[in-house]
Amino acid sequence: MITKTTRWPSPAKLNLFLYINGQQENGYHELQTLFQFIDLCDHLTITSNQSGQITLAPDIPGVKTEDNLIWKAATLLQQHSQCEFGAHIEIEKILPMGGGIGGGSSNAATVLIALNFLWQLNLSNDTLAALGVKLGADVPIFVHGFAAFAEGIGEKLQPATPKELWYVLIKPEVSIATVDVFTHPDLVRNTPKQPLNALLEATYVNDCEKIVRSVYPEVDYQLSWLLEYAPSRLTGTGACVFAEFNSEKEAQDVYSLIPDNATGFIARGMNTSPLNRTLEEYKSLCKI
């Protein structure tokens, strides 16, 4: 066990496009989507110990410890590996909850990667991803750490290299539950599957966007505002919307115009997760 206190990034993701191709008998939706990381991150400071307990600080308002994906991921890893070690995890929360940028899933993946290293379990990323998918369909993308085209229910990943553009994100003052979007009777569920090359060359679309804009006027308002300046879309099932730019200056210029009552961020697209880089840095330090 490595007892050193370590600090780990937990990055957000964007769905650059999202198409829903059908629905399985178990209720899960078949989809095609393109994931890319952005350099907007929560951070987790983790200290492993021999207590066997998983403790978190600070509490997240409205979220019980046993419902927190950070605690769930650590406990799941303990149980799977029969590890008797524990950890104290401090959370620096930047990513908005209910935003469609993968905050909870990313936190879970960061815990799996970090504790696998700190507890010296030596589990493969495939094993960690298989554990992670029990916590959420997006967790494997954060475990593997590369931008990817995803199919199936999101578990079939193919590495991809979309342009690493600059983005302006706005988080409307609503929190959207994924289940509410995917169970909406008017959701498009029959977009024909297409080869990746065709999807990459087409105009990017999110099949959830029409429903979300109709049900949540605040999302519609913010997305309409962004569309005045650049190509813009919903990410995931929302509520975050984003506009894409070729340069940081273009993004900064539009970001400076965001209304005072809106919560916004500037971020850079990343095809390799910063979590991967941090893990490699800690591995190198341990060899010295």
UniProtKB/Swiss-Prot annotation:
Q: What class of enzyme is it?
A: transferase
> Which biological pathway?
Isoprenoid biosynthesis; isopentenyl diphosphate biosynthesis via DXP pathway; isopentenyl diphosphate from 1-deoxy-D-xylulose 5-phosphate: step 3/6
Which catalysed reactions does the entry list for this protein? 4-CDP-2-C-methyl-D-erythritol + ATP = 4-CDP-2-C-methyl-D-erythritol 2-phosphate + ADP + H(+)
Q: Does the keyword section mention Kinase? A: yes
| Gene3D superfamilies reported in the protein's UniProt record | 3.30.230.10, GHMP kinase, C-terminal domain
Q: Which positions are tagged coiled coil?
A: none
Active site residues according to the UniProt entry: K13, D138
- From what superkingdom does this record's organism come? Bacteria
Biological processes per GO annotation: isopentenyl diphosphate biosynthetic process, methylerythritol 4-phosphate pathway; terpenoid biosynthetic process
By its UniProt entry, which InterPro entries does this protein fall under? GHMP_kinase_C_dom (IPR013750), GHMP_kinase_C_sf (IPR036554), GHMP_kinase_N_dom (IPR006204), IspE (IPR004424), Ribosomal_Su5_D2-typ_SF (IPR020568), Ribsml_uS5_D2-typ_fold_subgr (IPR014721)
Tell me the keywords, alphabetical order.
Answer: ATP-binding, Isoprene biosynthesis, Kinase, Nucleotide-binding, Transferase
- Kindly give the PANTHER family that the UniProt entry links to this protein: 4-DIPHOSPHOCYTIDYL-2-C-METHYL-D-ERYTHRITOL KINASE, CHLOROPLASTIC
Can you say what this protein is called?
4-diphosphocytidyl-2-C-methyl-D-erythritol kinase
Record the organism: Aliivibrio fischeri (strain MJ11) (Vibrio fischeri)
Q: Which gene encodes it?
A: ispE
